């Protein structure tokens, strides 16, 4: 048996856009993502699936059913977000002292008068409904992490189709410092309205995915799909500023911890000669971001500077982890190799002979230990595993995946890392962004026609873990690689 500390919590994470819609009156058409997945050109190009989020699992209307199942599973922690566009569907007056010509946003003035002014523009029906959802969550004894941003931006801040076509004269999302100002105001306002129900805050989920896939990995089908290294750097610079200003805004109304949730891969060398490639990949993909919001070190243009207004803007780290990335040293740097990690054939085996998921992601649980211990050794900030899961409709691999990754969290804790919870992705199947409904990550299977939720076998395994606070002897055999032979037929 592998027992966890009594204070450790098992739970789940989910996102508004992916889960909320699907019942009458739940539609939220005022976001960049909604416009993006409905765009006929995106569909024709195969950038998006053609599945529509308004046909989703229906959490907005059926949240009590979701919470009932979580309670039966013995879960004790949840991470949800408020959809910005539901609260402010229409443009707000420009912030005071806003100067778009300034690249650096070192302060966003937020006071009670400003919050009251924002309150006049807020959608009270949406606010009240979120309060009902969060109150129901808390009434079941769940610890609650409220995340401010899980990818969709209000349309009045980002028109992704215009940007995709090269028109930057309209709302341009994270390319504009206006979005930095507005995100700080939004985050402070949400904390002001919901602080009585919240235990901890996160500013953002996976900002590196937004800046990376939106402007570099444009085949992924993420908005705005405009290929430009320069614009990717600008977006990430503004996202870092937005996190820091949101941190300040939340802290102006709350004393509770504020973290950020980041997409992580475990970088592994192809051979022993490729360790330098691992260090380079970690710096490029992880440390540069956290050094900015913890140490204030950031690159502006070609110059590395220290900004005190960015320093120390983090209380905890949310670790999202699914698989690894194998890297190889080259003359000019390094390359990521296909056939491993995210770059595998679906429902097959990787070049290492490890099984792959419906998404083509390699089974590699030891990478979670690698990521957790490296964060701890570098920053000594406490952590949650805020996403970990697998696209596996048949639920063949998920029981193995679940137990094997929870075991790696146990290893990390025993090695000294301060990890306080494991939040699986996700409780139920949901809308997997550009891939639509084809990728099913849920412990609960969703019938999208009836909205009924069914328990997969892995949900029973997770209940065993959560209710005992341990990987019990009865399920310890699942801490292993799933047999791969059936996947070859």
Curated annotation (Swiss-Prot):
Site (Not N6-methylated) residue list: 76, 102, 124, 138
EC class name: hydrolase
Modified residue annotations for N6-methyllysine: 116, 135, 273, 311, 332
Catalytic activity: Hydrolysis of terminal non-reducing beta-D-galactose residues in beta-D-galactosides
Disulphide bridges: none
Positions of the catalytic residues: 206 (proton donor), 387 (nucleophile)
Keyword annotations of the record: Glycosidase, Hydrolase, Methylation
SUPFAM superfamilies linked: (Trans)glycosidases (SSF51445)
Origin: domain of life: Archaea
GO molecular-function terms, A-Z: beta-galactosidase activity; beta-glucosidase activity
GO terms classed as biological process: carbohydrate metabolic process
E.C. number(s) listed in UniProt: 3.2.1.23
SUBUNIT field: Homotetramer.
Cited NCBIfam families: Beta_gal_BgaS
Protein family per UniProt: Belongs to the glycosyl hydrolase 1 family.
Protein name as it appears in the record: Beta-galactosidase
Lineage of the organism: Archaea, Thermoproteota, Thermoprotei, Sulfolobales, Sulfolobaceae
Protein encoded by which gene: lacS
């Amino acid at each position: 048996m592998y027992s966890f500390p009594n204070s450790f919590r098992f739970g789940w994470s989910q996102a508004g856009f992916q889960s909320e819609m699907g019942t009458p009156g739940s539609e939220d058409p005022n976001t960049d993502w909604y416009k993006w997945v409905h765009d006929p050109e995106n569909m024709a190009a195969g950038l998006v699936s053609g599945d529509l989020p308004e046909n989703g699992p229906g959490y907005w209307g059926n949240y009590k059913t979701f919470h009932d199942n979580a309670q039966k599973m013995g879960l004790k922690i949840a991470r949800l977000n408020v959809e910005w566009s539901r609260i402010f569907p229409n443009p707000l007056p420009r912030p005071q002292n806003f100067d778009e010509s300034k690249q650096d946003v070192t302060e966003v003035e937020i006071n009670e008068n400003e919050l009251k002014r924002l309150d006049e523009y807020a959608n009270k029906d949406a606010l009240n409904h979120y309060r009902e959802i969060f109150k129901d969550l808390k009434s079941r004894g769940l610890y609650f992490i409220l995340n401010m941003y899980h990818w969709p931006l209000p349309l009045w801040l980002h028109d992704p189709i215009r940007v995709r076509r090269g028109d930057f004269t309209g709302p341009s999302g994270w390319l504009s410092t206006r979005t930095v100002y507005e995100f700080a105001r939004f985050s402070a306002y949400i904390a002001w309205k919901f602080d009585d129900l919240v235990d901890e805050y996160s500013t953002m989920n996976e900002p590196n995915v937004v800046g990376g896939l939106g402007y570099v990995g444009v085949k992924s089908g993420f908005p705005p799909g405009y290929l430009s290294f320069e614009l990717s750097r600008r977006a990430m610079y503004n996202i870092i500023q937005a996190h820091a200003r949101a941190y300040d805004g939340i802290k102006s109304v709350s004393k509770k911890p504020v973290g950020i949730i980041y997409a992580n891969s475990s970088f592994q060398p192809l051979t022993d000669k490729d360790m330098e490639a691992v260090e380079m990949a970690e710096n490029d993909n992880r440390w540069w971001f956290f050094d900015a919001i913890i140490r204030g070190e950031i690159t502006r243009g070609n110059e590395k500077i220290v900004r005190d207004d960015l320093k120390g803007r983090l209380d905890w780290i949310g670790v999202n982890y699914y698989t690894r990335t194998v890297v190889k040293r080259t003359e000019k740097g390094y390359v990521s190799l296909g056939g491993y990690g995210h770059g595998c054939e679906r429902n097959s085996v990787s070049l290492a002979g490890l099984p792959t998921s419906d998404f083509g992601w390699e089974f590699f649980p030891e990478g979670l230990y690698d990521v957790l211990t490296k964060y701890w050794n570098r920053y000594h900030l406490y952590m949650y595993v805020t996403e970990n899961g697998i696209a596996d409709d048949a639920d063949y691999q998920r029981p193995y995946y679940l137990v094997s990754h929870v075991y790696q969290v146990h290893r990390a804790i025993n090695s000294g890392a301060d990890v306080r919870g494991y939040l699986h992705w996700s409780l139920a199947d949901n809308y997997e962004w550009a891939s639509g409904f084809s990728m099913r990550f849920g412990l609960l299977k969703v019938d999208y026609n009836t909205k009924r939720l069914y328990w997969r076998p892995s949900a029973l395994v997770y209940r065993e873990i959560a209710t005992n606070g341990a990987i019990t002897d009865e399920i310890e055999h699942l801490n292993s690689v799933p047999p791969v032979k059936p996947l070859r037929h």
